Amino acid sequence: MTSTLTISRLTKRFEDVAALTDVSVSVAAGERVALLGHNGAGKSTMMKIILGLIPASEGRVEVCGAAPGSREARRQVAYLPENAAFHPALTGEEQLRLYLRLRGENPRQALPLLERVGLHAAAKRRIGTYSKGMRQRVGLAQALIGHPRLLVLDEPTSGLDPVSRRDFYALLDALAADGASILLSSHALTEVEARTDRILILSEGRKVAEGSLADLRRSADLPVALNVTPRNGYASEIAASLPGAIEVGGLLHLTCSQSEKLAVFGRIAGLGTKVADLEVLPPSLEDIYSHFSRRDGQ
């Protein structure tokens, strides 16, 4: 599969401070990759290098087959910052028409773009009356000008309500289905858990983990939580069969390692109809992120 973004052994220093050290990653066409890390981990620095805003100190970065910041790369890359800012006196349509002209595109595309992000009905309203979610949608519409092959999104859903977040990710899913590559940073781990194909975790400027959620779960080897619901009258008997189980509110809670999981499932299955229900809770992305991004002294 062709890579839209290729980063090889990227290092960035600011005088004696290393913001990024020996980071390698690639993003394929149609792939959605989450970029995670604590404040100061190097996420923003990586994005600035990809966009050609600052140079790398060492390593190789290729954006759509071109150098970052080159005319060819800029033509195929779109960026959406955490807080998209627009002139409050302009309408949504006027703002898009302005950007279309600047990009050498037909201004008549403004309304179709606004319709694509769900803002057609508000196209004639001034942006100063828009909510945060609506302004982010204007930013996304702007990012879609020219059919970019790579979208770089910095905390794109910050400040959005749950419905706006859901709709925003639905738009990203459609873009990825059309072949666009998406690299997004976010602190909202629960939402990227189900809406990205791969996860990259940075800590203190280094890549500490990369892979699908399933890959990271296997690598972290964190315990699995189980909630067992006993049928009436069988709680004590079931608890005796499951060492370490704790009864809380009629449920039996226990944890086991990944290697013990199948054996524990077998013991529970052996209890037959004495068990009314079983809930399996694998490690969440938040658990995995905390595991990999743990720093000295934490």
For each feature predicted by the language model, list its residue ranges.
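Residues that scaffold the ATP/ADP-binding catalytic core of kinase and kinase-like folds
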Residues: 71, 216-219, 288
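ABC-family P-loop ATPase nucleotide-binding domain
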Residues: 1-11, 295-298
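Short, flexible helix/strand-to-coil boundary loops that buttress conserved ligand/catalytic motifs
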Residues: 90, 217-220, 292
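ABC transporter nucleotide-binding domain
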Residues: 169-255
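ABC transporter nucleotide-binding domains
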Residues: 5, 12-203, 209
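Short, charged/small-residue-rich alpha-helical element at the C-terminal edge
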Residues: 222-298
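Structural motif detector for alpha-helix initiation sites
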Residues: 92, 110, 213, 282-285
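Residue-level recognition of well-ordered beta-strand positions that form the cores
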Residues: 8, 26, 227-229
